[in-house]
Each structure stands twice: as C-alpha cells, then as structure tokens.
C-alpha cells in the first residue's frame, strides 16, 4: 500500500513522498518524521514493541512530535532530556505540572495515542474525550473551528451511543513546534447535562475565542 501511494503520487503529481506506518496515528507520524526520510525506500514502520528501542532514544526532546522548545526547556529543568526518561517519569507529577498536556506527554512517550477513538471505555467511566493530531499547521480560524466541530460531534456521538449526558466540558489546544509549543486548557460546568453536538461546540468555541492567541495549531 505504501509503495502504491508513492507510485501514485509520482505518476499523478511528479512528487516523491515518504510514508510513515504505525500501530496508531502517533507512531505513524513519528515513523514519518524520524525515520522514513532516512531510508532508501522512503518508508518506515513503527510498532508498539519498537517504542523502547526507537522512541525512547530520541533526543533532544524537541525532535518528538508535540514538544516545542519551551516545553523542552521545562522538561530539561525537571531532569528529563530523553523520551525514555519522560516515559519513566511519574504520571501524577507530569499532570500536576502541565495538566492535560502532562497526561498526553506521558502516554505519547509510551507510544500510546488515543486520538482516533478516544480513551477506552472503562468500568464506571463517566467521561468521553477525543484528541486529534494535525498533520500540518492550521492558522486560519475557520479551519480550526471546523476541526473543533468535528471533534465535538465525535464526542457527542459517543455519549449518545452510550445514552450518557455530561455537564463539564473541557478543551485543550497545543501550539505548533514552530511556536515553541505551549497552548491552553480550560473547563466549564454548564447548567444542564447534554450530549448535543452544538451545545458542546458552543462551549468549546467560547474557550477558543477567549483564549486562542493566534498561534499555529
């Protein structure tokens, strides 16, 4: 399939391309960024079992997707200079320091990405979430709003599937590595429980309009 994509790109557009393949979107992105461009075939594949030998050796930390220069400096001050050290750092301390971004950093360091289907439903779980990796920088507000709407629809759909409603809505946005990372995370508890897409979207849009700094996503 990867070779077929490369052949199609060359045949239709005259462009050579590299391909990253992984057990999830994160690993495929890392395979693309960190290895595929160095191979003769332009193709690289990363599996979960490759994480200790490939991902954990990555340094500086800013080579890791989602870690900008500012975040790298913060982690360095905590004694973390490799992805392996990040993976072994206590999750609760990362969450205390960075909030939801700390949670994402920890699981990404283990090669775990929940962006496609959200967190697995556990016994007694009463929350639904979805994160999404953007494979290019988004700078236009209307583009970002479209992505937000898609995410809200997925979360609302899952809530409706399980016949659940919720009152607390959270939105976290991380900025591009070109912007030295960073971002924001905000939560709000609304008056009435909902699983309606537009109710969730309006709340997230309020966060976006109030806290988005105009940096690349």
From Swiss-Prot:
One Pfam family matching this protein: IMS_HHH_1
Domain UmuC: 1-68
GO biological-process terms attached to the record: error-prone translesion synthesis; SOS response
GO molecular function terms noted in the UniProt entry: damaged DNA binding; DNA-directed DNA polymerase activity
Listed PANTHER family: DNA REPAIR POLYMERASE UMUC / TRANSFERASE FAMILY MEMBER (PTHR11076), DNA REPAIR PROTEIN HOMOLOG YOBH (PTHR11076:SF35)
Family: Belongs to the DNA polymerase type-Y family.
Protein name: DNA repair protein homolog YobH
Organism annotation: Bacillus subtilis (strain 168)
């Amino acid at each position: 399939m990867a070779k077929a994509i490369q052949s199609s790109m060359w045949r239709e557009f005259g462009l050579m391309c590299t391909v990253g393949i992984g057990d999830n979107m994160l690993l495929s992105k890392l395979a693309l960024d960190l290895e595929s461009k160095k191979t003769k075939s332009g193709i690289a594949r990363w599996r979960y079992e490759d994480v200790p030998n490939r991902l954990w050796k990555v340094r500086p930390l800013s080579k890791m997707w989602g870690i900008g220069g500012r975040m790298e400096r913060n982690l360095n001050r905590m004694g973390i200079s490799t992805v392996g050290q990040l993976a072994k750092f206590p999750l609760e301390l990362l969450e205390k320091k960075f909030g939801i971004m700390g949670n994402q950093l920890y699981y990404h360091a283990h090669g775990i990405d929940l962006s496609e289907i959200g967190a697995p439903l556990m016994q007694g779980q009463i929350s639904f979430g979805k994160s999404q990796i953007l494979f290019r920088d988004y700078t236009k507000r209307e583009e970002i709003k479209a992505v937000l709407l898609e995410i809200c629809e997925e979360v609302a759909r899952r809530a409706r599937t399980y016949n659940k409603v919720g009152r607390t809505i959270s939105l976290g946005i991380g900025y591009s590595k070109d912007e030295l990372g960073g971002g924001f995370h905000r939560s709000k508890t609304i008056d009435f429980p909902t699983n309606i897409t537009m109710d969730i979207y309006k709340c997230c849009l309020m966060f976006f309009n109030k806290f988005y700094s105009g940096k690349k996503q």
